């Protein structure tokens, strides 16, 4: 019964860390990633559709992305969606593909993006702490219902704290690695 709580807590915290790493992939670092376009939706016959669902997105080099739509009539719509997304780049439509030329990041931009990464890390820590609180509440309920003793409850809460500390440490490492990648010139 306690082991199930530990396992669920670890699993939920791991999912929070994975979500953080997914969020990090949308932040720009030295090399532009195709993931920077993940949040962009294109109006595809009246339905907001992810950009990578209406064409292929590939990286040509460290500062250039190319979008090749599967239907040429979507070029204007993709171009409009990118402009509205305000990602700091103007789309270059050549009639076949759209190229995005990202300028090199200034040190000021790098600092702002690193700050965003840190904020994402803090959000993940809050999620982990909420998971810890839920797990501790489950343990306290078991103690209240006389299913476990007070000593078992204290040991369980200590174990949950150890799991939380591990998750927070992983989040801190992820944030540090991402900040290093962003600030590296």
UniProtKB/Swiss-Prot annotation:
It is found in: Cytoplasm. Keywords: Cytoplasm, Protein biosynthesis. One of its GO terms (molecular function) is ribosomal large subunit binding. Residues 137-158 are annotated as: Disordered. GO terms for biological process: cytoplasmic translational termination; translation. Residues 140-158 have a biased composition (Basic and acidic residues). Responsible for the release of ribosomes from messenger RNA at the termination of protein biosynthesis. May increase the efficiency of translation by recycling ribosomes from one round of translation to another. PANTHER family: MITOCHONDRIAL RIBOSOME RECYCLING FACTOR PSEUDO 1, RIBOSOME RECYCLING FACTOR. This is Ribosome-recycling factor.
